[in-house]
Protein backbone atom coordinates (compact mmCIF):
# COMPACT_ATOMS: atom_id res chain seq x y z
CA UNK A 1 0.00 0.00 0.00
CA UNK A 2 1.17 3.53 -0.76
CA UNK A 3 1.88 5.83 -3.65
CA UNK A 4 4.81 3.81 -4.94
CA UNK A 5 2.43 0.92 -5.54
CA UNK A 6 -0.02 3.17 -7.35
CA UNK A 7 -0.61 3.22 -11.11
CA UNK A 8 1.87 6.03 -11.76
CA UNK A 9 4.61 5.05 -9.36
CA UNK A 10 6.84 7.33 -7.32
CA UNK A 11 7.53 9.81 -10.11
CA UNK A 12 3.92 10.92 -10.37
CA UNK A 13 2.73 14.30 -9.09
CA UNK A 14 0.29 12.54 -6.76
CA UNK A 15 3.17 10.68 -5.17
CA UNK A 16 5.25 13.82 -4.73
CA UNK A 17 2.25 15.47 -3.08
CA UNK A 18 2.05 12.49 -0.69
CA UNK A 19 5.78 11.97 -0.23
CA UNK A 20 5.36 10.26 3.14
CA UNK A 21 3.98 7.26 1.22
CA UNK A 22 7.41 6.76 -0.27
From Swiss-Prot:
Keywords: Acetylcholine receptor inhibiting toxin, Amidation, Disulfide bond, Ion channel impairing toxin, Neurotoxin, Postsynaptic neurotoxin, Pyrrolidone carboxylic acid, Secreted, Toxin, Voltage-gated sodium channel impairing toxin. Expressed by the venom duct. GO terms for cellular component: extracellular region; host cell postsynaptic membrane. Is commercialized under the name XEP-018 by Activen in the cosmetic area. When applied as a cream, it is claimed to reduce fine-line wrinkles. One of its GO terms (molecular function) is toxin activity. It is found in: Secreted. InterPro entries: Conotoxin_mu-typ. The modification Cysteine amide is found at residue 22. PROSITE patterns: MU_CONOTOXIN. Disulfide bonds join 3-15, 4-21, 10-22. The modification Pyrrolidone carboxylic acid is found at residue 1. It comes from the Eukaryota. Mu-conotoxins block voltage-gated sodium channels (Nav). This synthetic toxin blocks both voltage-gated sodium channels and nicotinic acetylcholine receptor (nAChR). Inhibits the skeletal muscle rNav1.4/SCN4A (IC(50)=1.3 nM) and the brain rNav1.2/SCN2A in a long-lasting manner. A low inhibition is also observed on neuronal mNav1.6/SCN8A and mNav1.7/SCN9A. Modestly blocks nAChR alpha-3/beta-2 subtype (IC(50)=450 nM) (partially reversible) and, to a lesser extent, alpha-7 and alpha-4/beta-2 subtypes (reversible). Negative results: 1 uM does not block cardiac mNav1.5/SCN5A and DRG-specific rNav1.8/SCN10A channels. 5 uM does not block voltage-gated potassium channels rKv1.1/KCNA1, rKv1.2/KCNA2, hKv1.3/KCNA3, rKv1.4/KCNA4, rKv1.5/KCNA5, rKv1.6/KCNA6, Shaker, hERG1/KCNH2. Found in both injectable (milked) (IV) and dissected venom (DV). The cysteine framework is III (CC-C-C-CC). Belongs to the conotoxin M superfamily. This is Mu-conotoxin CnIIIC.
Amino acid sequence: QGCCNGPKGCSSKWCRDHARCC
